[in-house]
Amino acid sequence: DTFGSFMGTEGTHPWSQGFPLTTPLEKFGGPALPDSVEVTWEDRFYPKAWGHPELREAIVDYYNSRYGSSITPENVMVFAGGRPGIYTVMAFLKEHIKVRIGNIEWPAYLDILTQTNTEYDIVPFTKENNFHPSNSEYFDREGVSEGTGLLPVISNPQNPSGQTRSGEELRELIEMAEKPGNGILLDEAYEMFHTPSVSGIEFVQDLDNSNVFLAGACTKGLQSPGIRIGWIIASKTNIETMANYSSFGMGGVSHPSQHYAVMLLEPSRVKKARAAVEQHYNWQRERYGKAFEEMGLGVYTGNGGFYHWLELPEGMNSEELNKRLFKHGAAILCAKDCDMARPHSKDPSYQTPYSRFFRFSFGPLLPETFESDIKLFREVYEEYKRDSGLE
């Protein structure tokens, strides 16, 4: 109602949106994206509950070649996007499992946890820990009964902050997750938005005897959110459980979309795509971050993803900033929406500790709009500062 156009359409500034560019990243040698997919008479049959064999093989080949893993197609379940896979994992957790989730995470996790009646504890995210708590905080058993299992839910690279666990830190996280009584759901939607690309599968020792769940998708790094293809990598036993659910609760995933995903994952193509995504978004992260620092914003962004995690000066708040941006066809994501400790009923009396924080997305922004995006943001921000008596 404020601007008259849907966010993301021409003339708007989709700084609140979580989608990537869906055109080739030509500046960095990104490959073309497929513009068609062949559909045969066989594709009009019902799809298999666990995913098309060709796509499962393509996913396996990608992870095994990139990360030195040894998964098989029986470790892969295909879903209609990333979030149905995450929802399914949560829906089938046993009653003695408690989730640990960061105070700041992807907003949809709270919906999923609530709708599946999952018990969860919050792990603090603060300026003091740089919005990057230690691995051990997710597995702290103080006050946890002996028969309770712990399952951290972590996006990595993290949405909204871009904080990333890689190398030895990620190895330690997976080692903890594989211990008896533990598990993990690692959401790797932004796997390619880090140098180098990062996946927990690199450090998994015994997937089939673990409760490690890795979520991936074509949505971000493969630049194709509209085809709605995602997957879960897990033990054969856990995949079998999810496939049983698919047969009665989902009915499989569109064959044409799965064929498109196979084309995206063609080995020589995906190698070029991964390199281009890394370079393009590293470049965007760096120059937007520098511009925000020059404005005097607090920048707490990690080295992954395509968001900036920013703090306004004292005396300002992100909700008021957003209202002012709306008038110009722009928006940010207020941090309160990422606050996993807020009541899901959206109790108006709840005061988030993150009122000055917000997420700025450079994911869908074209390189040539950098100057105009920063100019508009600076104008609205500076006007708000003046009105707040801060200048």
For the regions a language model picked out, list residue spans one by one:
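N-terminal "arm"/small-domain region of PLP-dependent enzymes with the aminotransferase-like
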Residues: 1-50, 65, 147, 182, ...
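Conserved glycine-rich beta-strand-loop-beta hairpin in the small C-terminal domain of fold type I
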Residues: 14, 105, 262, 278-289, ...
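Generic structural signal for small/hydrophobic residues in well-ordered secondary structure
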Residues: 15-18, 59, 76, 99, ...
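Short, solvent-exposed loop/turn segments at secondary-structure junctions
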Residues: 18-22, 83-84, 105-107, 128, ...
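Conserved PLP-binding catalytic core of the aspartate aminotransferase-like
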Residues: 22-23, 281-282, 296-329, 337
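Conserved core of the PLP fold type I
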Residues: 39-180, 191-207, 213, 375, ...
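Conserved core segment of the aminotransferase class I/II
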Residues: 56-58, 205-279, 286-292, 375, ...
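Conserved PLP-binding active-site segment of the aspartate aminotransferase-like
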Residues: 234, 309-316, 332-381
